[in-house]
Amino acid sequence: MIFEIIVRDKKTRARLGKLKTFHGEINTPVFMPVGTQGAVKTLSPEEVEKVGAEIILSNTYHLFLRPGHEIVRKGGGLHKFMGWEKPILTDSGGYQVFSLARLRRIDEDGIYFNSHIDGTRYFYTPELVMEIQKSLGSDIIMPLDICLGYGASYWETKEALEITLRWLKRSIDYKNNSNMDHQLLFGIVQGGFYKELRKEAVERMLNIDLPGLALGGISVGEPKDKMYEIIDYTVSLLPEEKPRYLMGVGAPEDLVVGVSMGIDMFDCVLPTRLARHGVFYTSKGRKNIKNAQYKEDFSPLEEDCDCYTCRKFTKAYIRHLFLQHETFSYRLLTIHNLRFLFRLMENIRKSIREGRLEEFKKEFLTEYLRDDRENRLEKEELWSKLLI
């Protein structure tokens, strides 16, 4: 059994589980930090492990362009290449092709696109994506799919779904004939924000024996309430026995709400990206280290945080470093933001085990959203909906 459910929450769809991979077990629900180029930005693999990561995500598209999957293969695979011994999930790069690449063109065979780096023309196919991920040797792999932005028409979304499903079959065929048994291929449920299409995608995927299912096409410009609505609906259709992966979503409030809806796996660039812009997480919302109020603040970023940053340094010191563009400040903020999310996931798992996830969710959201001054009106509206 690849995925084992240990505890089911009685009041929500949340589950406590273990996902077995070639490079070890993962406790779920789990957050995966993103190491796009084969490294979590500013941190060493040892630091990433110390903050609590059990699995990381790397990007097929970026590693294909640089250094090239053949280089990684010759280096012994991605684990050895980057010095990470725990599980790795690689996404297909489909989202990046649609968001970064120039002059892309899609047909039944694949995607033609120009590299965002130097304009080189490439042809990205389901088979090539599988070949790249075979060379990388990642534990969990994703098929090429078409990810559309919010607002795409019904017929555009339906056509994209049909192609995505056909590409999934081609990906499975390639994997089955390529000595990739140790790699877990998840399916990606697309369908945009049309419930009928999401339902069709799930029903057709249930006829295929996949070890896990991912929700794609989420967090692509839609309002938060619409995002939660489509997540909740789609998860209600998914089989209990398979892990559920919500792609590209990982704000603190999204983790708590997503777990209560039945999501097992999350990834997001937000904690590392925000850190490089001076933003850090606290139990009372996001704060910005550049603010003048921290000039003579000799307290840690978060009083009860056990991370290296909070044990050793003050807001005043980190603010000083950040304003001088010292890269050490990016590292310190990244360590804190990731540890904040991993502590949050630890508390979520503990609350599921103790049968009090709903209470924890209300306590966390009340504290986290109430004092967040950024986008105050939007946050207050979201807060009222989440606590219903």
From Swiss-Prot:
GO MF terms held by the record: metal ion binding; tRNA-guanosine(34) queuine transglycosylase activity
Q: What catalytic activity is recorded?
A: 7-aminomethyl-7-carbaguanine + guanosine(34) in tRNA = 7-aminomethyl-7-carbaguanosine(34) in tRNA + guanine
Keyword field contains Zinc: yes
The protein's name: Queuine tRNA-ribosyltransferase
Q: Which InterPro entries match?
A: ArchSynthase1/Queuine_TRR, TGT, TGT-like_sf, tRNA_ribo_trans-like
Q: SUPFAM superfamilies this protein is in?
A: tRNA-guanine transglycosylase
Keywords carried by this UniProt record = Glycosyltransferase, Metal-binding, Queuosine biosynthesis, Transferase, tRNA processing, Zinc
* Oligomer status and interactors: Homodimer. Within each dimer, one monomer is responsible for RNA recognition and catalysis, while the other monomer binds to the replacement base PreQ1.
E.C. number, please?
A: 2.4.2.29
Offer a single GO CC term for the protein.
Answer: cytosol
Q: Which organism is it from?
A: Dictyoglomus turgidum (strain DSM 6724 / Z-1310)
Q: Which residues form the active site?
A: D91, D267
UniProt record similarity statement = Belongs to the queuine tRNA-ribosyltransferase family.
This protein's source sits in the domain of life called Bacteria
Name of the gene encoding the protein in the UniProt record: tgt
The keyword Transcription is assigned to this record: no
- Residues annotated as transmembrane: none
* Segments of this protein annotated with the region RNA binding: 248-254, 272-276
Q: In which pathway does it act?
A: tRNA modification; tRNA-queuosine biosynthesis
